[in-house]
Amino acid sequence: MKKIYVISSALILLGILAGISFFLIRDANAKIPPTITLTTQNNDSYRFGDNHKKLKLVEFVYTHCPDICPTTTQKMVALKNKLQKTGVYGKDIQFLTISIDPYRDTPEVMKKYMNSFGISNDGNWVFLTGSHASIKSDLKKIKEAASSLQFQYKDPGNGFFIHSTFTFLLDENNKFIKKFPMGEQFNEQEVYDYISKQL
């Protein structure tokens, strides 16, 4: 009986370790494809494969979100201010806000969202969405970018998206480094400290 218990416990432990290893390996291999091109708040093209040789902090949002999205953006503003004081923001790291609702979040809407947080339109924080002319293909691109980082979302039909609650730190080649919680759980000091260690 004791032998069976030991074997069962060992198998359960192996299963847990295998599961943890799977998720660690999956995250380590996560990367936004370089071929993805989206539209900025200025109606310019942003291609992930272009020479953006900076770390990137990425959040996925929709501007009609009533709580967690604007809370995250506000906390990222506080983080931006910390990074600006040390001369890191813009020089070594770029912020990206990607809309998961490009039908409503036009470039103009994204610019208004940016302005509502007092964010400078200087290219150091880029707001990405789809283009009206290619909205269907851009929807797929946004989904591909999100899925590459295991960020999931769905519109249940009422315009209020159900979505994952993580932001993502990427390296200069858009490869996953670490994820951080969104909303009230986003700790700007913790993220600041982690980013500083990467530089």
Enumerate the predicted regions with their spans:
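Structural microenvironment flanking redox-active thiols in thiol-disulfide oxidoreductases
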Residues: 75-142
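Thiol-/selenol-based redox modules, centered on thioredoxin-like
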Residues: 152, 156-199
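Short loop/turn microsegments at loop-to-beta-strand junctions
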Residues: 33-34, 55-56, 164-166
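A short beta-strand-turn-helix
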Residues: 37-55
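N-terminal targeting signals for export/organelle localization
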Residues: 1-39, 196-199
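Short active-site neighborhood of thiol/selenol oxidoreductases, capturing the structured segment around
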Residues: 49-70, 76, 95-96
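Sec-exported extracytoplasmic/periplasmic mature domains
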Residues: 81-88, 115-119, 147-151, 175, ...
